């Protein structure tokens, strides 16, 4: 077990920690990462494996006929919730890459239907898992049920069963959208506890779909705690716990299976001579941890995942630096947790996610809000894609890795530098599809004003 280290201990000999405390962009590399991932990984007193990821993917597949009927936007995909893999060579300079440092791609979760963000993966999976469990309990499904049986869960009899139950969640925005929209569409009573960071348009989108929005004056941690406490008083309430849920995490992990096929279809090889670097925005940590777990299980030693966080809200970097046995907050480091990247405005990381990532994660880096807005505009100008500020966080990753002494030293130490020209850099964009035009116009205006 790594030692528990306080912020003060770090400041004396750890340059990234000193930069972090000054709210300066920095790169931290994980000294506990294992090159070869174990087949079974410990998390929250349990163990998970590729088998659990495949079970989550199978659940999505079973529910596809129902989802196709409930959500018109899924008719074209047969009920499959997925995002494209986009080439992004026009963003090389914006990402800090120069010629000979690999190819750049975008995993465009900002286009995910239904929820419009990466949260469609984990959030909808947990709602589906709950619906399946209740349907089995009430005789609406059997283990032998076929597509027609799942499609019938949209019928009045099934909706009457689901209507007895409440699905609740605490969120800064995107997870609330995912849970609220999916739960209400199936007939559940949906309650979303929103922190002060949540954008007004996200609250309105939920209310328009019949979701109860409870606004809190405090931060993400407070909204989650309030939602958890309220749900605990009602035996017919299911609380989706973003800080602790394995169902969420495994729902995210299923993305790795589809990405593996997308990489093959694009002719992208991932092996010792062709490393894959993945850059994932990180809030409490469940989504990027789930995806990283899935990718390490599927692609093994040759995928290297990095989490991106705002300079004022680096809760995961703080947690990874401290190690197991501690649970620090960004406030402990003199940081404010104030950022325009609302989905990343989290003061304290998920402990299960941090435990899972200790042997799997390559590192973390932080970015300024101004950088997010500049890069949002660069993405628009280069590709035409419209993303939220938080979705731009990963774009700084390649530059940290290839353009800083810390990053280059790590690449050499890992034996990756000689293979950089054959590498693939994958920036995972996390939200943007449903941003109202007037809100996006303000994002763009700020980004262009920054130059």
Curated annotation (Swiss-Prot):
Top EC category: lyase
Keywords annotated in UniProt: Lyase, Pyridoxal phosphate
EC numbers, comma separated: 4.3.1.18
Catalysis: reaction(s): D-serine = pyruvate + NH4(+)
Superkingdom of the organism of origin: Bacteria
Necessary cofactors: pyridoxal 5'-phosphate
Location of N6-(pyridoxal phosphate)lysine modifications: 119
Pfam families: PALP
BP GO annotations: D-serine catabolic process; isoleucine biosynthetic process
SUPFAM superfamilies reported for this sequence: Tryptophan synthase beta subunit-like PLP-dependent enzymes (SSF53686)
GO molecular function, one term: hydro-lyase activity
Family stated for the protein in its record: Belongs to the serine/threonine dehydratase family. DsdA subfamily.
Record's protein name: Probable D-serine dehydratase
